[in-house]
Design a protein with these regions (language model features):
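Bacterial N-terminal signal peptides that target proteins for export
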Residues: 1-8
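Bacterial N-terminal signal peptides
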Residues: 8-19
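Cleaved targeting-peptide boundary
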Residues: 24-31
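Extracellular protease catalytic domains of secreted zymogens
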Residues: 32, 37
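Intrinsically disordered, low-complexity, compositionally biased regions/tails
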Residues: 38, 69, 73, 83, ...
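Predominantly extracellular/secreted and cell-surface proteins with exposed
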Residues: 40-123
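Extracytosolic secretory-pathway proteins
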Residues: 98-100, 105-173
Length: 173
C-alpha cells in the first residue's frame, strides 16, 4: 500500500511540475548588465558637478516580453548620499548596443523619492577593444509608471548626455 501511495504522489508531483517548467520563459533574448560610475564636470546642464555616481545593473528580457533584473544606484547631492534599489519592470535594446532600463523603486534613502516611484536610464555598450570609445550612460530619471513605460518603449536618444562612464557596460540584443 505504501508503494502505491508513493507512485501516486510521484505522478501528482510530475503532473504539476512539467507544465510549470514548460510555462517558464526560456533564456533571455536580450540583456544588459554593468557596473559603472561617471563624473560630469562643470559647466553642465545641471549647474552642479556630478561626481562618482555608481550604478550597478542586470536586466533580462524574455521571448514572451517579460523582464527580470534589478539595479542599484548611489547618488550624492550637495554632499548628501542617497541609495536606491530598483526592480526592473521594462527593458528594451535599440541599435544593437543601447539598452533602456526602468523599474520600480523598492527602497530609497532619499525622503523625496518614495518606494513605489519609478526610475530609468539608458546605457551604451561601445565595445571592448582598446580603441573602442568609452561606454556611456544617461543619468537616472525618476517619475511615475507611465513615464517609465514611455521611456523604455521609445527609441529616442537621451535628452541630456549620454556621458562617458568608467566601468563596463554589456548589452546583448
Amino acid at each position: 500500500m505504501h508503494i502505491r501511495s508513493f507512485f501516486l504522489l510521484a505522478a501528482i508531483v510530475a503532473a504539476l511540475t512539467v507544465p510549470a517548467a514548460l510555462a517558464a520563459p526560456g533564456g533571455p533574448v536580450a540583456s544588459a548588465s554593468g557596473g559603472i560610475h561617471w563624473t560630469i564636470p562643470l559647466p553642465n546642464a545641471f549647474g552642479v558637478e556630478v561626481v562618482n555616481q555608481p550604478l550597478a545593473f542586470n536586466a533580462r528580457k524574455y521571448a514572451d516580453g517579460s523582464v527580470s533584473g534589478r539595479f542599484e544606484y548611489h547618488q550624492i547631492v550637495e554632499g548628501t548620499s542617497f541609495d536606491f534599489n530598483v526592480d526592473v519592470t521594462c527593458m528594451n535594446v535599440y541599435d544593437g548596443n543601447r539598452a533602456k532600463i526602468g523599474g520600480v523603486v523598492k527602497s530609497s534613502s532619499d525622503p523625496t523619492i518614495a518606494p513605489g516611484t519609478f526610475a530609468w536610464f539608458q546605457v551604451f555598450d561601445n565595445g571592448e577593444a582598446q580603441q573602442a570609445t568609452p561606454d556611456q550612460s544617461s543619468l537616472v530619471g525618476f517619475g511615475d509608471e507611465a513615464a517609465n513605460e514611455a521611456f523604455c518603449n521609445s527609441p529616442n536618444l537621451p535628452r541630456f548626455g549620454p556621458w562617458d562612464v568608467q566601468g563596463n557596460v554589456q548589452v546583448q540584443p
